[in-house]
Design a protein with these regions (language model features):
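Extended, charged catalytic domains and RNA/DNA-binding interfaces, predominantly
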Residues: 1-203
Length: 203
């Protein structure tokens, strides 16, 4: 998610930057930073679905595999000050593999594969997906390079794409417009997994 502070007049000063421009999040941060410097407008990106990133969200390397450097860590800290830690596609705060002594670490765990079901989950990925581990890595990076790219305000959200704040069960309109109330909505395939139909996102 990318949020512009102000009204449409600010947001219309730039074209939306999407994965069709680049799948490298560092390019998004650079584009937002350039927009902010050129216009004086404030903008931020909100990472989410860390639990479905297969170890990519809080990786300690740059997108190209080189070691994380202070420049990019500082840019990320500025562009991503907030994280959506829990939402409709599972919890991204803690995982029982990482916090085996915490009985609450297995809340709404969704850890079979990545978002599109194209890559199965491996235990080695988990430490780079969940907020608790990221906070620890952030403190370590702050000691090593003087900047913490994982210092977040955390929010919980529905991640609904219907623009409706209707998360209560008796008034739940679904995540997408395609699953608004109708008899077969619980069988609606939102994202069809390529590896195994059981990994598809339903509802």
């Amino acid at each position: 998610n990318v949020v512009f502070r102000g009204d449409g007049a600010e947001a219309r000063k730039t074209l939306p930057y999407s994965q069709f421009d680049s799948q490298n999040p560092e390019d998004l941060w650079r584009a937002l930073d350039a927009f902010s410097k050129e216009t004086g407008a404030q903008v931020l990106a909100i990472p989410h679905n860390g639990n479905l990133s297969n170890g990519r969200l809080f990786n300690l390397e740059n997108f190209d595999g080189t070691p994380l450097n202070k420049e990019l860590a500082t840019l990320r800290a500025r562009m991503e000050p907030l994280m959506e830690v829990t939402q409709i596609k599972g919890d991204g705060e803690a995982h029982p593999f990482l916090s085996p002594d915490d009985e609450f670490a297995d809340f709404e765990t969704w850890d079979a594969a990545n978002l599109n079901g194209t890559e199965l989950k491996e235990e080695s990925m988990l430490q780079f997906e969940y907020a608790r581990a990221a906070l620890k890595y952030g403190l370590k990076l702050d000691m090593e390079m003087g900047v913490n790219p994982f210092r977040y305000v955390m929010v919980v959200s529905t991640d609904s794409h219907t623009s409706m704040a209707t998360a209560e069960e008796e008034n739940f309109f679904g995540k997408h417009s395609g699953v608004e109330p109708e008899p077969g909505r619980w069988k609606h395939v939102t994202i069809e997994a390529q590896l195994d139909p059981k990994l598809s996102i339903i509802g």
